[in-house]
Every structure is written in structure tokens, then in C-alpha cells.
Amino acid sequence: MKIAVIGQSLFGQEVYCQLRKEGHEVVGVFTIPDKDGKADPLGLEAEKDGVPVFKFPRWRARGQALPEVVAKYQALGAELNVLPFCSQFIPMEVINAPRHGSIIYHPSLLPRHRGASAINWTLIHGDKKGGFTIFWADDGLDTGDLLLQKECEVLPDDTVSTLYNRFLFPEGIKGMVQAVRLIAEGTAPRCPQSEEGATYEGIQKKETAKINWDQPAEAIHNWIRGNDKVPGAWTEACGQKLTFFNSTLNTSGLSTQGEALPIPGAHRPGVVTKAGLILFGNDDRMLLVKNIQLEDGKMMPASQFFKGSASSDLELTEAELATAEAVRSSWMRILPNVPEVEDSTDFFKSGAASVDVVRLVEEVKELCDGLELENEDVYMATTFRGFIQLLVRKLRGEDDESECVINYVEKAVNKLTLQMPYQLFIGGEFVDAEGSKTYNTINPTDGSVICQVSLAQVSDVDKAVAAAKEAFENGLWGKINARDRGRLLYRLADVMEQHQEELATIEALDAGAVYTLALKTHVGMSIQTFRYFAGWCDKIQGATIPINQARPNRNLTLTKKEPVGVCGIVIPWNYPLMMLSWKTAACLAAGNTVVIKPAQVTPLTALKFAELTLKAGIPKGVVNILPGSGSLVGQRLSDHPDVRKIGFTGSTEVGKHIMKSCALSNVKKVSLELGGKSPLIIFADCDLNKAVQMGMSSVFFNKGENCIAAGRLFVEESIHNQFVQKVVEEVEKMKIGNPLERDTNHGPQNHEAHLRKLVEYCQRGVKEGATLVCGGNQVPRPGFFFQPTVFTDVEDHMYIAKEESFGPIMIISRFADGDVDAVLSRANATEFGLASGVFTRDINKALYVSDKLQAGTVFINTYNKTDVAAPFGGFKQSGFGKDLGEAALNEYLRIKTVTFEY
């Protein structure tokens, strides 16, 4: 068909392009005149294609059509007028001229919300359904016969922009094309509009957008979102006109502590809180407003209303003003359809796309001597004013982290001045626990108090979960693409590496880790873990699946892997940073947010890690850390309805309780890495020296505080005595001492209660008849030091043969030469199945044993050889689920199946 397109905007441009792709001949485009030298996108596109473009300032005068305008239109010979978005009044002489008449797009479900502000009124009235109508133009106001309608659900927090961008724009374009197709085929319906339920509302203007406070909270919320962003719902307060944006009724778990904001006519004063401005309806229900615009046009987070915005108040130097103007020119080049880049100009609302973000970052790099901005910097400061403030702060060397106040405990240790945060970390801020409750964390080397640490309460858990949920659902973390998320995790690994000596020193101070080991393992593997999973971020993908076709139609099924949401991670005390990293890296790579409960006795590296997330630019609320007791913090995380996954490493007893709580609360996804009694089988045909070396490591590594420590060594009869002799010789060479000394092999146990359990464990072994070859007692010196211990003649029925010590205690049992199946039966006679090992030169025997051992990991002629790429996790009552490797990602993802029919 020959079509005349009458209208404007990006919407009109897209409709025009799609009609041409359909093969229609657009004989002319009628759009608005250029404004400040800038042409409308529809006109620009048509001019590129050589289509005649007309820019009449008006079509009629004194109620009569202008003859010269009508003549130019009629000369085109259009068969159909398409009006995708038109702000001009088109005379009926033009509307009725084509053979097929004229069709108009209207952004509501007619006959409801006739008039120019249809989207606004859809939201203001709280309609549950929205949509658009394409109708045949007549001489009434949106009263013509219906051709096509499509509807969508209106979400509780939808605004004009979100509803338009999500549905009305993309589906409206398709709808216009479909309508023209129906007309061309001769099947387009003409359904008279019913007057039943018809409404007409006037155009929303600033003067009519004042908030009426004498109504319920939901009505106030609908008014605010219905006027967001234009014209903006406003009220008078503090002697000026305040305009509110970004309203929500989702206020669960929100604290009302803050500073009162008196509002004339309101049922109750508003409250400025850390989350934003809480408002109340006349029904005493709350709503939350996140952004406020002042009378001078300045936009700020509502939470900063009484503080002002430091970034907005920066006074620029002459050089910085010159840079700002150069950047303004860059914005003008990127946004050709914006008449003028003003302070309030929004980069994305002005038509910028993700490719333009890359361009802006690169242009700024050239303008500012190589200054490296990140893509997410643009997303966090979308207005020109905000972007310039962010840019100037970067140029001055001021980081966002400076806005976060961090209180430290400082200690001069290991030739370093340690700065250790000691408060809870919630929503990107270090805060006191409810009631300012604290507890002492102890240095196991001498039993002294390192510092007092905030002790999280149940209400603190609720706040942290709310912060994580907000970051997941509405924050930057859920909006950036996977590759940018990976870049942030790479940066976090780099920041951790820059602070590795400090982290290792804190591990030695708080957990008793030998410094040289902590540097390589506790911290080194933590860094490797974040780097490994950073690389996975943009490689998480689903599959396409062939299914039976619904003939004569066809089907396509695909799967998507999605983050589960807010995750709770509960970590043990033996590797405070490494266990945090094993779980958190996979969790974040999958796109989740997290609330972490470090072990109560070892909180300090986790809190230092929290500080490093700020330095790395991880958005606020993505990571939250709560030192505290398992009975309060761990239990509340397990019970919380907004937590969708728990990852736990710890005892089997506690793991069972967590699993039960997860089931009873909301059937959370759960992964458990629990107790172990890992068998190590040493055959006579092994490399004995290597077996001794690795056997020592399998038990005494990290003072025996090792999940996969060899809980029981089975040594073949013919080499048993020689093996024991060599082990004792090696034990005698071990230096027990201060973990910060570089030649120390064996540091203190993690905490006093654990030390006492090890003493009792050894006493029970002796009482039951096992031979104590060496050790078995506390070292006579200050601190929680325990002697490396060796037991022999351990029988299968003994307590120490069945139960985990989690300490530096080697349990040795003999087995008859050549009796492979018997020793396998003994090795598997346990409810645990975390790890295992075998030493032999016979590859056939090694593979046979590895097949039969009931454990998640089998080491052959080595031990403790974990790697970030190798899945780690147990069988039986050692738990289920995996840390590390690609398999770990699946613990923090859910699979969605999508099926199409076409």
C-alpha cells in the first residue's frame, strides 16, 4: 500500500522503518518542525531514504484546513494514513482522504482513558491491566472504531517510563505493523467503541500534579508513579516545592528510624531514612520514595535530603569547567536528537543505548588523559550534572568509597599497620548491631582480646536481607550485563591481591593461621577463586532442546539459567577467607546477592573483605556481612522468607538443622559441606618417602583444622612400623610457635573450646586402648597450642576411629598385606564421604580403589591438592552440592524452560 506516516518521535521512526521492511511504499512523512535546529527522528530517517518530508507548523487556521497543506498531502496519493504518535491536530479533510482512511495508536485500552495523558491515568487509577489500542480515526476524541488491542499486566511499581519501555513501545510498534497488514489483507475489523466504562481525563500538567494527602497510601503511590517523570507529583514542604519520583509500596522490613519531614496536609510527617523518604497515607500504610527533585531542578536520593548531596555541591575549577563543556559536546554528538544538553538531561532517556555507553567511556578517556571510567559509572550517574560530578571526583582522585565511613581497630603487627573494620556491613555501610551489642574476638596465639566486634541480632539479619533483595531486584547489580559483572569480580580479585599481606596477617592474628601458609592458601586461593569465577560470568548459558512439534505448527524450547536471588552463606572458622571466597565467588558470578555469616570466632577477614568490595566498586547491598551466633544469625537466614538459597560449611549436626529449617520456611535451595572422616590408604608398593610427606600434610596441614584432613590412615602391615617411625621423626622436626614467624610450621588451634575438645579426644583414645606414640596434650605455653599427635593400634570400634578430631591428630590402623577389598570395606564403613586418598605405584590398584571409595574426592599419590577448577563436595552425611569448578555455579542458579510455538 501507499502510506502517509503522520507523527513524530522514536516510536514514529520505528513504525516507519518496519512498514518499509514490510514492503509498503511510504509516499510521504509529515512531522513537526525542527526545534533549535534539531530534526525529529522520524523526519531524519525518512530524509535518509529520500522519502518526501513535510514539516508543517500547523494544518489549519481559524478552524479551517489550510488549502495549500491539503493540496500537498493529496498530491501524494496515499491509500492509508498511519498516525503512530501525533501531537498536531489533523483536519478531517486529510483523515478521510485515503481509500482506507486513517489509523491511530493510543496508549490505553479504549474506551478507558481517552485523552492525551492516557498512560499517566492508567497508573493513577491503579489499573491492573494496561495496553494500547489502534483505532480508526473519526471526528471525535479517541472515539473511533477499534481495529486492534493488546494488553499487559501493570506491575505494582510501574511508572510511565517502565510501562512504556517494557510494553507500549516495543509491542506498540508490532501492533501498528500488524494493523497495517490486516488492512492490506482486507481483514481489518471495525468494532464500535462502547460508551460503557468510557473515561476521559485531561492532560496532566505540573500545576495539576500536586499530591492530595487525604487518601490511602496506595492512592498516593499511584499518583506519584502516574506522574513519574513528567510532569512530576509534587508537594510543598520545607518552604519549597518538592517533586517525588520512584515510589514503591514494598516496605517490608523497612526501618522508620530517621529524621521527620513535616508535610502540610499529610496525615503524618514523612521520615527521611537510609532507604529513602517514607510517606504515610490516611490509612497509616507506608510508601517509600527514593528520589526527590528540589525546586531548582536538582535531583537527589531522598535519603540525602537533609544531608544535601556532596557530589552535587562540588565547586568546579576553571579547568574542570572546561572539561565539563568538552564532555557536554561529547554528549551532543552521541545524542543527536537532543536540542541541548542541560544539567538535567538524562543519557538513557535521551535515546542512548549500551553501545553509546562504550562510546562515552572512550571519548572521556581521550578528553581526560586516559582516565579509565567503567560502563557502570555511566549507569550510576545518568544525568549530565551527575555524570560531571562523578567525573570530577574521579579526576580529583576521590573514590566513592570515601563516602562510606569506616571505623577501624588499628594494630601494628607483622611490620604492618593493620586497619580492621569491626562493625556489621549492611547495604554498603559499616553499622553497629541493634542495641550496639558487641563481643570479644580472641588472638589464639596468646589468648588476648584483639578487639570488640559488633554482634548481629535478628533485626540486623532482616535489614541485611532487605538490602540484598533491593540490590538484586532494583539495583545496578541486576541491570549490568554479565561481562561487566565479571570485570567487577576481576577487579575485586586485584584489590584482594593488593591487600594480600594484610589479609594473611589478619588470618594469623584472628584464626592462628601460619602466615606463610595463609599467604599461599587462605588468601592466595581466595584470590584465584574470584578470578576463576569472574571468567565464568559471561559463559553461563542454557540450551536449545528439540521437542515434539505441535503440527502443523512448530515448536522451539530453550532453557535459561538465572540467579536464584538473595543467598545466605554460613562459613566455618578454619579457613575464614577461603571458605567465604569459595562460596561467595560462585554466588556473585551467577548474579545473586549475598548475606554472609562468618564464624563468630573469626570475623575479621570477612569484615576486611567487606571493605575491599567497596574499593572494588561492588554495588551497595550486593555483599552484606554479619558476625554473630549461629543460633541467631544462621537460624534467621535459614528461616527468612526472602532468602532463596543457603550455602553452609560446618558440622553435620548443624547442617541437618539448617536443612530442616530451609525446608520448613520456604523450601530453600541448600548446599551442605559437612563433617568428614576421610580415609587414606597407604599400600606397601608406594613411594614411602612421598607417602610420609603427604601423610603428614594430610593430617597436620593448617593444624589439622582442615575439612578434608585424613581422619584415618590405613597402612599396609609390611610397611606399618617403618611408616610410623618416619612420621614421628618428621613430627619432631616441626616448629611450634608464633604463626607470624616465617619458620613456624605449626600454629595455635583456632580457639580455646576447640583445644579442650582435642585434649578430651586424645584422652578417650588412650582410655579405649589406642597407642599414643607422641603428642596428645596442650603445649605448655600461652595460647591455644596443641601438640602434633600420632596414635597407632587403632581398632575399628574405637571412638577415635569413627569420629572426626578436626585437629593435628594422626590415627593409624594396620591392614593385612594384599587385602585390598577388606581395607576398602573398613575405609567405607563410615557415614562420612568428603575425601579420601590412596598411595600405590600400581595404577590398576589405584583406579580400582578410587572406583570403590565412597567419597566426593579421591587423591591418588597426593593429598590436599584442591584447585579452583575442580569440584569439591562430599557424599553421605558429608553433605551435598559442590564448591569450586563449573559445578559450583549450578548451586546458585535456577533453570527456566521457555517454549515457543510458531
Swiss-Prot record:
Residue numbers binding NADP(+): 571-573, 597-600, 630-635, 650-651, 673-674, 757, 804-806
Site (Essential for catalytic activity): D142
Positions where N6-acetyllysine occurs in the chain: K882
UniProt-annotated binding residues for (6R)-10-formyltetrahydrofolate: Q88, F89, I90, D142
CDD domains on file: ALDH_F1L_FTFDH, FDH_Hydrolase_C, FMT_core_FDH_N
Domain (Carrier): residue spans on this chain: 318-395
Effect of D142A: Loss of formyltetrahydrofolate dehydrogenase activity. Loss of formyltetrahydrofolate hydrolase activity. No effect on aldehyde dehydrogenase activity
EC id: 1.5.1.6
Function recorded in the entry: Cytosolic 10-formyltetrahydrofolate dehydrogenase that catalyzes the NADP(+)-dependent conversion of 10-formyltetrahydrofolate to tetrahydrofolate and carbon dioxide. May also have an NADP(+)-dependent aldehyde dehydrogenase activity towards formaldehyde, acetaldehyde, propionaldehyde, and benzaldehyde.
Domain remark from Swiss-Prot or TrEMBL: The N-terminal hydrolase domain has an NADP-independent formyltetrahydrofolate hydrolase activity, releasing formate and tetrahydrofolate.
Description of how the protein assembles with itself and partners: Homotetramer.
Family as reported in the entry's similarity comment: In the N-terminal section; belongs to the GART family. In the C-terminal section; belongs to the aldehyde dehydrogenase family. ALDH1L subfamily.
Protein name, per record: Cytosolic 10-formyltetrahydrofolate dehydrogenase
Gene name of this polypeptide: Aldh1l1
